[in-house]
Amino acid sequence: ALSTVNGALSEAVGQMYVAKYFPASSKEKMLKMVGDLQKALGDRISSLEWMSDATKAKAQEKLAAFIVKIGYPDTWRDYSGLEIKNDSYWANVRRSNIFEVNYMLADVDKPVDKTRWGMSPQTVNAYYNPTTNEICFPAAILQPPFFNPEADDAVNYGAIGVVIGHEMTHGFDDQGRQYDKDGNLKDWWTEEDAKKFEERAQVMVNFFDSIEVAPGVHANGELTLGENIADHGGLQVSFAAFKKAMETAPLEVVDGFTPEQRFFLAYANVWAGHIRPEEILRLTKLDPHSLGKWRVDGALPHIQNWYEAFNITEHDPMFVAKDKRVSIWLSLIHI
């Protein structure tokens, strides 16, 4: 019943959800974080040693053109034309389906409305859409453990900050990079830069292919490449934005953990979980995301700031030699 109402009246339900759980102050804070991460990603693109100036310029144009959607739509959908009656479940579903089809048909021969959302506000998820070059963060993901307006920057940048950076990085991953700033399927990379990107991406594929997720079963580095690149970029970009924020608002050690350590702990906390062996096998075959455990244990060994935060050495089990680490978004800027 809930899924039916959610499907037929998604934004009407979303409007009630937002009124109860997502104050305007949270949206303002999120807008600032997104701006900070856009700046950090722009700085990182500018300082990449392997990318040419021509491709960098196009990448910056695409980044600047991002459409940002946070919390809920600026204008709520009008459901006044949908009649809900106390006659039968089937009749209400039929009327809602007709209403939805007519809503879509009304768009025929009209320009694409880029203000519309591809997710309802009550959805715990986020997305990047390459055909519209937009990033979207519904109100429901802007709750703990992802976002807490009462928490400090270490927690929020480590959790929702990485999600923001993750979605932004999708615009430049193995699939997103094939679209230009206007969402057109167009190659804007030089041939040499594309080759360098693919070489670096292959390091990621090989690393995840080597991970044994269950006895005799390995992760699929090719299937999960885009999401792994996005996690890799999201961590680096969010950490850079976090360190920049601390220049004007320094944080203290809490419960024995430095701000930098708490950033990475917040990230790990988001993906903490436990699933059955059968689900591990199913997700490994079908899901383009790595398993939660490996979104942490597979991503952090390629982040230099994580090594520095926890004093990781070659004697630690998660240590990966520098020449074996992924370096797609490795910047010349030292944080």
Role assignments for model-derived ranges:
Residues L2, N6-S10, G14-L332:
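Intrinsically disordered, low-complexity linker/terminal regions across diverse proteins
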